[in-house]
Amino acid sequence: MVNHKLWGGRFEASLEDWVEEFGASIGFDYRLAPYDLQGSLAHVKMLGQTGIIAPEEAAAIQAGLEKLLVRYQAGELEFDVRNEDIHMNMEALLTEEIGPVAGKLHTARSRNDQVATDMHLYLKDQIGQIADKLLNLRQVLLNLAEEHVETIMPGYTHLQHAQPISFAHHLLAYYQMFSRDSQRFAFNLEHTNLSPLGAAALAGTTFSIDRELTADLLGFKGIYHNSLDAVSDRDFILEFLSNSSILIMHLSRLCEELINWCSYEYGFVSLSDTFSTGSSIMPQKKNPDMAELIRGKSGRVYGHLFSLLTVMKSLPLAYNKDLQEDKEGMFDTVDTIQKSLDIMAGMLSSMTVNKEKMLVSTQQDFSNATELADYLAKKGLPFREAHEIVGKLVLECSKAGYYLQDIPLSRYQEVSSLIEEDIYQALESQTAVQKRNSLGGTGFAQIRQELERAKRQLEK
Protein backbone atom coordinates (compact mmCIF):
# COMPACT_ATOMS: atom_id res chain seq x y z
CA MET A 1 0.00 0.00 0.00
CA VAL A 2 1.42 3.38 -0.96
CA ASN A 3 1.98 5.81 1.94
CA HIS A 4 0.87 9.37 1.09
CA LYS A 5 1.99 10.93 4.37
CA LEU A 6 4.32 13.91 4.07
CA TRP A 7 6.83 11.76 5.94
CA GLY A 8 5.86 8.55 4.10
CA GLY A 9 8.89 8.06 1.86
CA ARG A 10 10.66 5.74 4.26
CA PHE A 11 7.62 3.48 4.80
CA GLU A 12 6.22 0.60 2.76
CA ALA A 13 2.84 0.44 4.51
CA SER A 14 0.34 2.92 5.86
CA LEU A 15 -1.02 3.15 9.37
CA GLU A 16 -4.27 1.34 9.98
CA ASP A 17 -7.19 3.71 10.48
CA TRP A 18 -7.62 3.02 14.20
CA VAL A 19 -3.90 3.51 14.83
CA GLU A 20 -3.95 6.70 12.79
CA GLU A 21 -6.84 7.99 14.86
CA PHE A 22 -4.98 7.22 18.09
CA GLY A 23 -1.96 9.21 16.94
CA ALA A 24 -3.82 12.17 15.47
CA SER A 25 -4.06 15.49 17.32
CA ILE A 26 -6.18 17.50 14.87
CA GLY A 27 -9.19 16.87 17.12
CA PHE A 28 -7.78 19.43 19.55
CA ASP A 29 -4.80 21.23 18.01
CA TYR A 30 -7.08 22.78 15.37
CA ARG A 31 -7.21 25.63 17.88
CA LEU A 32 -3.67 26.49 16.83
CA ALA A 33 -4.76 27.15 13.23
CA PRO A 34 -4.46 30.98 13.20
CA TYR A 35 -1.14 30.80 15.02
CA ASP A 36 0.15 28.15 12.63
CA LEU A 37 -0.71 30.44 9.72
CA GLN A 38 1.00 33.39 11.43
CA GLY A 39 4.14 31.33 11.94
CA SER A 40 4.13 30.14 8.34
CA LEU A 41 3.64 33.67 7.00
CA ALA A 42 6.65 34.89 8.97
CA HIS A 43 8.70 31.89 7.88
CA VAL A 44 7.96 32.28 4.18
CA LYS A 45 8.68 36.01 4.29
CA MET A 46 12.07 35.18 5.78
CA LEU A 47 12.71 32.46 3.18
CA GLY A 48 11.99 34.97 0.43
CA GLN A 49 14.00 37.84 1.90
CA THR A 50 17.07 35.66 2.52
CA GLY A 51 16.92 34.15 -0.98
CA ILE A 52 16.46 30.61 0.30
CA ILE A 53 13.50 30.32 -2.06
CA ALA A 54 12.75 32.45 -5.12
CA PRO A 55 10.79 35.69 -4.57
CA GLU A 56 7.95 34.54 -6.83
CA GLU A 57 7.69 31.27 -4.87
CA ALA A 58 7.57 33.15 -1.58
CA ALA A 59 4.91 35.48 -2.98
CA ALA A 60 2.76 32.55 -4.16
CA ILE A 61 3.03 30.80 -0.80
CA GLN A 62 2.28 34.01 1.08
CA ALA A 63 -0.80 34.66 -1.03
CA GLY A 64 -2.00 31.10 -0.45
CA LEU A 65 -1.51 31.38 3.31
CA GLU A 66 -3.41 34.66 3.38
CA LYS A 67 -6.31 33.01 1.53
CA LEU A 68 -6.31 30.19 4.07
CA LEU A 69 -6.41 32.73 6.89
CA VAL A 70 -9.45 34.41 5.34
CA ARG A 71 -11.12 31.04 4.89
CA TYR A 72 -10.32 30.10 8.50
CA GLN A 73 -11.82 33.33 9.80
CA ALA A 74 -14.94 32.62 7.75
CA GLY A 75 -15.18 29.11 9.24
CA GLU A 76 -14.66 27.46 5.85
CA LEU A 77 -11.62 25.25 6.55
CA GLU A 78 -12.20 21.54 7.05
CA PHE A 79 -9.53 19.36 8.62
CA ASP A 80 -8.82 15.69 7.92
CA VAL A 81 -7.75 13.24 10.63
CA ARG A 82 -5.59 11.47 8.02
CA ASN A 83 -3.34 14.53 8.03
CA GLU A 84 -2.65 13.99 11.73
CA ASP A 85 -2.21 17.50 13.05
CA ILE A 86 -2.81 21.16 12.30
CA HIS A 87 0.55 21.57 10.56
CA MET A 88 0.07 18.82 8.01
CA ASN A 89 -3.55 19.81 7.50
CA MET A 90 -2.50 23.35 6.70
CA GLU A 91 0.18 22.17 4.30
CA ALA A 92 -2.34 19.90 2.56
CA LEU A 93 -4.82 22.77 2.27
CA LEU A 94 -2.09 25.08 0.99
CA THR A 95 -1.13 22.49 -1.64
CA GLU A 96 -4.76 22.36 -2.79
CA GLU A 97 -4.75 26.15 -2.97
CA ILE A 98 -1.46 26.81 -4.84
CA GLY A 99 -0.07 23.46 -5.99
CA PRO A 100 3.34 21.79 -5.45
CA VAL A 101 5.16 25.04 -4.63
CA ALA A 102 3.52 24.74 -1.21
CA GLY A 103 6.11 22.06 -0.45
CA LYS A 104 8.80 24.75 -0.30
CA LEU A 105 7.22 26.31 2.79
CA HIS A 106 8.73 23.64 5.00
CA THR A 107 12.27 24.46 3.88
CA ALA A 108 14.52 25.00 6.94
CA ARG A 109 11.68 24.12 9.30
CA SER A 110 10.53 21.07 11.25
CA ARG A 111 7.20 20.35 12.85
CA ASN A 112 9.16 20.41 16.10
CA ASP A 113 9.96 24.13 15.98
CA GLN A 114 6.68 24.79 14.15
CA VAL A 115 4.49 23.42 16.95
CA ALA A 116 6.61 25.09 19.61
CA THR A 117 6.17 28.40 17.78
CA ASP A 118 2.41 27.89 17.50
CA MET A 119 2.08 27.22 21.21
CA HIS A 120 4.22 30.19 22.19
CA LEU A 121 2.05 32.44 20.02
CA TYR A 122 -1.16 30.93 21.35
CA LEU A 123 -0.18 31.12 25.00
CA LYS A 124 1.23 34.62 24.63
CA ASP A 125 -2.16 35.70 23.32
CA GLN A 126 -4.13 33.87 26.01
CA ILE A 127 -1.97 35.11 28.89
CA GLY A 128 -2.67 38.64 27.67
CA GLN A 129 -6.40 37.97 27.78
CA ILE A 130 -6.17 36.43 31.25
CA ALA A 131 -4.18 39.45 32.44
CA ASP A 132 -6.98 41.74 31.24
CA LYS A 133 -9.62 39.66 33.02
CA LEU A 134 -7.57 39.62 36.21
CA LEU A 135 -7.26 43.39 36.00
CA ASN A 136 -11.04 43.64 35.70
CA LEU A 137 -11.58 41.37 38.71
CA ARG A 138 -9.17 43.42 40.80
CA GLN A 139 -11.05 46.58 39.82
CA VAL A 140 -14.34 44.96 40.85
CA LEU A 141 -12.84 44.10 44.24
CA LEU A 142 -11.60 47.67 44.69
CA ASN A 143 -14.99 49.11 43.81
CA LEU A 144 -16.69 46.80 46.29
CA ALA A 145 -14.11 47.55 48.98
CA GLU A 146 -14.64 51.30 48.54
CA GLU A 147 -18.34 50.81 49.28
CA HIS A 148 -17.68 48.79 52.44
CA VAL A 149 -14.80 50.42 54.31
CA GLU A 150 -17.03 50.86 57.38
CA THR A 151 -19.00 47.63 56.98
CA ILE A 152 -18.09 45.49 59.99
CA MET A 153 -17.96 41.70 59.82
CA PRO A 154 -16.45 38.88 61.86
CA GLY A 155 -12.89 37.95 61.02
CA TYR A 156 -12.22 34.23 61.33
CA THR A 157 -9.49 31.81 62.27
CA HIS A 158 -10.25 28.06 62.22
CA LEU A 159 -13.68 29.16 60.88
CA GLN A 160 -14.39 30.52 64.37
CA HIS A 161 -15.10 34.18 65.13
CA ALA A 162 -11.73 35.75 65.92
CA GLN A 163 -11.78 39.56 65.72
CA PRO A 164 -14.10 42.05 64.02
CA ILE A 165 -12.76 43.47 60.77
CA SER A 166 -13.87 45.69 57.92
CA PHE A 167 -15.47 43.87 55.00
CA ALA A 168 -13.26 46.02 52.77
CA HIS A 169 -10.20 44.61 54.54
CA HIS A 170 -11.38 41.09 53.72
CA LEU A 171 -11.93 42.01 50.07
CA LEU A 172 -8.54 43.71 49.83
CA ALA A 173 -6.87 40.52 51.03
CA TYR A 174 -8.13 38.87 47.84
CA TYR A 175 -7.12 41.93 45.85
CA GLN A 176 -3.54 41.35 47.04
CA MET A 177 -3.68 37.66 46.13
CA PHE A 178 -4.95 38.41 42.64
CA SER A 179 -2.31 41.14 42.27
CA ARG A 180 0.40 38.55 42.86
CA ASP A 181 -1.36 36.28 40.35
CA SER A 182 -1.10 39.12 37.84
CA GLN A 183 2.62 39.42 38.53
CA ARG A 184 3.13 35.69 38.06
CA PHE A 185 1.42 35.76 34.66
CA ALA A 186 3.52 38.79 33.69
CA PHE A 187 6.69 36.78 34.42
CA ASN A 188 5.19 33.84 32.51
CA LEU A 189 4.59 36.13 29.54
CA GLU A 190 8.26 37.14 29.54
CA HIS A 191 9.33 33.49 29.36
CA THR A 192 6.76 32.74 26.65
CA ASN A 193 7.71 35.76 24.55
CA LEU A 194 10.65 34.00 22.86
CA SER A 195 10.74 32.48 19.39
CA PRO A 196 11.71 28.83 18.87
CA LEU A 197 11.24 29.17 15.10
CA GLY A 198 14.40 28.20 13.24
CA ALA A 199 15.51 25.58 15.74
CA ALA A 200 14.28 23.02 13.18
CA ALA A 201 14.13 19.42 14.40
CA LEU A 202 16.71 19.83 17.18
CA ALA A 203 20.07 20.98 15.80
CA GLY A 204 19.28 24.04 13.72
CA THR A 205 19.57 24.07 9.92
CA THR A 206 22.18 24.29 7.18
CA PHE A 207 20.20 27.08 5.50
CA SER A 208 21.20 30.69 6.17
CA ILE A 209 18.00 31.63 7.95
CA ASP A 210 17.34 34.85 9.85
CA ARG A 211 15.80 33.91 13.19
CA GLU A 212 15.76 37.49 14.46
CA LEU A 213 13.66 38.50 11.45
CA THR A 214 10.99 35.86 12.07
CA ALA A 215 10.98 36.65 15.78
CA ASP A 216 10.42 40.32 14.98
CA LEU A 217 7.68 39.55 12.43
CA LEU A 218 5.86 37.44 15.03
CA GLY A 219 6.18 40.03 17.79
CA PHE A 220 8.53 38.03 20.00
CA LYS A 221 10.99 39.98 22.14
CA GLY A 222 13.82 37.52 21.41
CA ILE A 223 14.77 33.99 20.42
CA TYR A 224 15.72 30.75 22.11
CA HIS A 225 19.50 30.53 21.98
CA ASN A 226 19.71 26.75 22.12
CA SER A 227 17.92 24.73 19.46
CA LEU A 228 17.55 21.65 21.69
CA ASP A 229 15.97 23.72 24.44
CA ALA A 230 13.68 25.46 21.96
CA VAL A 231 11.96 22.28 20.78
CA SER A 232 12.18 19.98 23.80
CA ASP A 233 10.99 21.91 26.84
CA ARG A 234 7.50 22.93 27.80
CA ASP A 235 8.34 24.81 30.97
CA PHE A 236 6.50 27.86 29.69
CA ILE A 237 3.30 25.77 29.64
CA LEU A 238 4.10 24.26 33.04
CA GLU A 239 4.60 27.75 34.41
CA PHE A 240 1.24 28.75 32.96
CA LEU A 241 -0.46 25.71 34.49
CA SER A 242 1.23 26.37 37.83
CA ASN A 243 0.17 30.02 37.82
CA SER A 244 -3.33 28.98 36.82
CA SER A 245 -3.45 26.47 39.67
CA ILE A 246 -2.52 29.16 42.19
CA LEU A 247 -5.03 31.56 40.67
CA ILE A 248 -7.91 29.09 40.72
CA MET A 249 -6.97 28.15 44.29
CA HIS A 250 -7.50 31.81 45.21
CA LEU A 251 -10.77 31.85 43.27
CA SER A 252 -11.85 28.64 44.98
CA ARG A 253 -11.19 30.07 48.45
CA LEU A 254 -13.26 33.14 47.66
CA CYS A 255 -16.01 30.92 46.23
CA GLU A 256 -16.02 28.85 49.42
CA GLU A 257 -16.60 32.02 51.43
CA LEU A 258 -19.34 33.25 49.10
CA ILE A 259 -21.05 29.86 49.39
CA ASN A 260 -20.92 30.09 53.18
CA TRP A 261 -21.92 33.76 53.31
CA CYS A 262 -25.05 33.28 51.21
CA SER A 263 -26.27 30.38 53.35
CA TYR A 264 -29.15 30.87 55.79
CA GLU A 265 -26.78 30.37 58.71
CA TYR A 266 -24.60 33.32 57.67
CA GLY A 267 -26.86 35.50 55.55
CA PHE A 268 -24.04 37.98 54.86
CA VAL A 269 -24.59 38.21 51.10
CA SER A 270 -27.13 37.31 48.45
CA LEU A 271 -25.91 36.30 45.01
CA SER A 272 -27.73 37.60 41.95
CA ASP A 273 -30.31 35.33 40.32
CA THR A 274 -28.17 35.43 37.18
CA PHE A 275 -25.46 33.44 38.99
CA SER A 276 -27.74 31.07 40.93
CA THR A 277 -29.89 28.05 40.14
CA GLY A 278 -32.86 26.26 41.69
CA SER A 279 -33.85 22.75 42.66
CA SER A 280 -35.99 20.33 40.67
CA ILE A 281 -37.82 19.27 43.84
CA MET A 282 -37.39 22.03 46.46
CA PRO A 283 -39.13 25.23 45.27
CA GLN A 284 -37.43 27.49 47.82
CA LYS A 285 -33.85 26.73 46.80
CA LYS A 286 -31.43 29.32 45.44
CA ASN A 287 -28.16 27.52 44.93
CA PRO A 288 -24.72 29.17 44.42
CA ASP A 289 -23.90 26.78 41.56
CA MET A 290 -21.47 29.05 39.73
CA ALA A 291 -19.35 29.51 42.84
CA GLU A 292 -19.48 25.76 43.45
CA LEU A 293 -18.42 25.06 39.88
CA ILE A 294 -15.38 27.33 40.09
CA ARG A 295 -14.45 25.61 43.36
CA GLY A 296 -14.89 22.24 41.69
CA LYS A 297 -12.97 23.15 38.54
CA SER A 298 -9.86 23.81 40.61
CA GLY A 299 -9.34 20.05 40.59
CA ARG A 300 -9.19 19.79 36.81
CA VAL A 301 -6.64 22.63 36.59
CA TYR A 302 -4.45 20.99 39.24
CA GLY A 303 -4.81 17.74 37.30
CA HIS A 304 -3.56 19.31 34.07
CA LEU A 305 -0.46 20.61 35.88
CA PHE A 306 0.40 17.24 37.39
CA SER A 307 -0.37 15.47 34.13
CA LEU A 308 2.15 17.53 32.16
CA LEU A 309 4.74 17.35 34.95
CA THR A 310 4.41 13.57 34.76
CA VAL A 311 4.72 13.58 30.97
CA MET A 312 7.86 15.72 31.12
CA LYS A 313 9.69 14.15 34.04
CA SER A 314 11.56 11.42 32.14
CA LEU A 315 11.76 12.75 28.59
CA PRO A 316 15.24 12.70 27.07
CA LEU A 317 16.19 15.54 24.72
CA ALA A 318 14.89 16.52 22.27
CA TYR A 319 11.37 16.06 20.89
CA ASN A 320 9.28 13.00 21.80
CA LYS A 321 5.73 12.16 20.75
CA ASP A 322 4.77 12.31 24.44
CA LEU A 323 4.78 16.09 23.98
CA GLN A 324 1.55 15.79 22.00
CA GLU A 325 -0.01 15.49 25.48
CA ASP A 326 0.92 19.10 26.31
CA LYS A 327 -2.01 20.72 24.51
CA GLU A 328 -5.40 19.50 25.74
CA GLY A 329 -4.70 20.41 29.35
CA MET A 330 -3.38 23.79 28.27
CA PHE A 331 -6.47 24.51 26.15
CA ASP A 332 -8.84 23.38 28.89
CA THR A 333 -7.02 25.44 31.52
CA VAL A 334 -7.20 28.55 29.35
CA ASP A 335 -10.96 28.07 28.93
CA THR A 336 -11.52 27.30 32.61
CA ILE A 337 -9.52 30.24 33.92
CA GLN A 338 -10.99 32.80 31.54
CA LYS A 339 -14.57 31.75 32.23
CA SER A 340 -13.97 31.53 35.99
CA LEU A 341 -12.57 35.07 36.07
CA ASP A 342 -15.59 36.39 34.19
CA ILE A 343 -18.01 34.55 36.47
CA MET A 344 -16.27 35.74 39.63
CA ALA A 345 -16.25 39.37 38.51
CA GLY A 346 -19.95 39.09 37.66
CA MET A 347 -20.89 37.49 40.97
CA LEU A 348 -19.06 40.08 43.04
CA SER A 349 -20.30 43.11 41.13
CA SER A 350 -23.94 41.99 41.32
CA MET A 351 -24.23 40.53 44.82
CA THR A 352 -26.11 42.22 47.68
CA VAL A 353 -24.33 42.71 51.01
CA ASN A 354 -26.30 42.51 54.27
CA LYS A 355 -24.37 45.02 56.41
CA GLU A 356 -26.70 44.66 59.39
CA LYS A 357 -26.35 40.87 59.51
CA MET A 358 -22.58 41.17 59.38
CA LEU A 359 -22.50 43.71 62.21
CA VAL A 360 -24.96 41.83 64.42
CA SER A 361 -22.84 38.71 63.96
CA THR A 362 -19.90 40.51 65.62
CA GLN A 363 -22.08 41.44 68.60
CA GLN A 364 -23.21 37.92 69.38
CA ASP A 365 -19.84 36.35 69.95
CA PHE A 366 -16.60 36.88 71.86
CA SER A 367 -14.56 38.37 69.03
CA ASN A 368 -14.03 41.47 71.21
CA ALA A 369 -12.11 39.44 73.81
CA THR A 370 -8.76 40.61 72.44
CA GLU A 371 -9.95 44.20 72.90
CA LEU A 372 -10.45 43.56 76.61
CA ALA A 373 -7.02 41.93 76.91
CA ASP A 374 -5.40 44.83 75.03
CA TYR A 375 -7.30 47.29 77.24
CA LEU A 376 -5.75 45.76 80.35
CA ALA A 377 -2.30 45.49 78.77
CA LYS A 378 -2.35 49.19 77.86
CA LYS A 379 -3.01 49.93 81.54
CA GLY A 380 0.16 48.12 82.54
CA LEU A 381 -0.98 44.55 83.15
CA PRO A 382 1.29 41.94 81.48
CA PHE A 383 -0.54 40.64 78.42
CA ARG A 384 -0.32 37.02 79.57
CA GLU A 385 -2.08 37.91 82.82
CA ALA A 386 -4.67 39.89 80.87
CA HIS A 387 -5.18 36.92 78.56
CA GLU A 388 -5.81 34.64 81.55
CA ILE A 389 -8.33 37.04 83.11
CA VAL A 390 -10.26 37.50 79.86
CA GLY A 391 -10.28 33.78 79.17
CA LYS A 392 -11.94 33.15 82.53
CA LEU A 393 -14.49 35.90 81.87
CA VAL A 394 -15.34 34.33 78.49
CA LEU A 395 -15.87 30.99 80.22
CA GLU A 396 -18.09 32.66 82.81
CA CYS A 397 -20.16 34.38 80.11
CA SER A 398 -20.46 31.19 78.06
CA LYS A 399 -21.90 29.32 81.01
CA ALA A 400 -24.29 32.17 81.91
CA GLY A 401 -25.42 32.82 78.32
CA TYR A 402 -24.29 36.42 77.79
CA TYR A 403 -21.37 38.34 76.26
CA LEU A 404 -18.50 40.52 77.47
CA GLN A 405 -20.38 43.74 76.76
CA ASP A 406 -23.19 42.50 79.04
CA ILE A 407 -20.98 42.15 82.15
CA PRO A 408 -21.80 44.84 84.76
CA LEU A 409 -19.03 47.30 85.61
CA SER A 410 -19.12 46.11 89.22
CA ARG A 411 -18.20 42.59 88.13
CA TYR A 412 -15.42 43.90 85.89
CA GLN A 413 -13.97 45.86 88.79
CA GLU A 414 -14.08 42.77 91.00
CA VAL A 415 -11.83 41.14 88.43
CA SER A 416 -9.49 44.12 87.99
CA SER A 417 -9.47 47.63 89.40
CA LEU A 418 -7.90 48.75 86.12
CA ILE A 419 -11.22 48.40 84.31
CA GLU A 420 -13.29 51.58 84.07
CA GLU A 421 -16.53 52.62 82.39
CA ASP A 422 -14.76 53.24 79.07
CA ILE A 423 -14.44 49.49 78.65
CA TYR A 424 -17.85 49.33 76.98
CA GLN A 425 -16.81 51.65 74.18
CA ALA A 426 -13.61 49.65 73.73
CA LEU A 427 -15.68 46.50 73.31
CA GLU A 428 -17.83 47.92 70.51
CA SER A 429 -17.10 46.31 67.14
CA GLN A 430 -16.67 49.62 65.30
CA THR A 431 -14.22 50.91 67.92
CA ALA A 432 -12.28 47.66 67.80
CA VAL A 433 -11.92 47.88 64.03
CA GLN A 434 -11.09 51.60 63.93
CA LYS A 435 -8.30 51.23 66.48
CA ARG A 436 -6.41 48.61 64.49
CA ASN A 437 -4.46 51.20 62.53
CA SER A 438 -1.12 49.43 62.42
CA LEU A 439 0.33 49.30 58.91
CA GLY A 440 -1.70 46.83 56.88
CA GLY A 441 -4.36 46.55 59.57
CA THR A 442 -8.14 46.71 59.37
CA GLY A 443 -8.47 50.28 60.69
CA PHE A 444 -10.51 52.52 58.42
CA ALA A 445 -7.62 54.95 57.87
CA GLN A 446 -5.31 52.09 56.87
CA ILE A 447 -7.89 50.69 54.47
CA ARG A 448 -8.37 54.06 52.77
CA GLN A 449 -4.60 54.37 52.33
CA GLU A 450 -4.49 50.87 50.87
CA LEU A 451 -7.33 51.70 48.48
CA GLU A 452 -5.41 54.71 47.17
CA ARG A 453 -2.26 52.65 46.75
CA ALA A 454 -4.19 49.94 44.91
CA LYS A 455 -5.78 52.50 42.58
CA ARG A 456 -2.35 53.85 41.65
CA GLN A 457 -1.17 50.30 41.05
CA LEU A 458 -4.04 49.58 38.66
CA GLU A 459 -3.39 52.77 36.71
CA LYS A 460 0.17 51.72 35.84
UniProtKB/Swiss-Prot annotation:
Record GO cellular component, one term? cytosol
What terms describe the molecular function in GO for this protein? argininosuccinate lyase activity
The record, for SUPFAM superfamilies, names: L-aspartase-like
The reply to whether Metal-binding figures as a keyword in the UniProt entry is no
Record's subcellular location: Cytoplasm
To which protein family does this belong? Belongs to the lyase 1 family. Argininosuccinate lyase subfamily.
Reactions catalysed, as given in the entry = 2-(N(omega)-L-arginino)succinate = fumarate + L-arginine
Q: What is this protein called?
A: Argininosuccinate lyase
Which pathway, per its entry? Amino-acid biosynthesis; L-arginine biosynthesis; L-arginine from L-ornithine and carbamoyl phosphate: step 3/3
Enzyme class, broadest EC rank: lyase
Q: Which Pfam families match?
A: ASL_C2, Lyase_1
Is Cytoplasm found in the keyword set?
yes
Q: What is its main location?
A: cytoplasm
EC number(s) of the enzyme?
Answer: 4.3.2.1
The record's keywords, sorted A to Z, are:
Amino-acid biosynthesis, Arginine biosynthesis, Cytoplasm, Lyase
Q: Name one GO biological process term.
A: L-arginine biosynthetic process
Question: Mind telling me which PROSITE patterns this protein's record contains?
Answer: FUMARATE_LYASES (PS00163)
HAMAP family membership: Arg_succ_lyase (MF_00006)
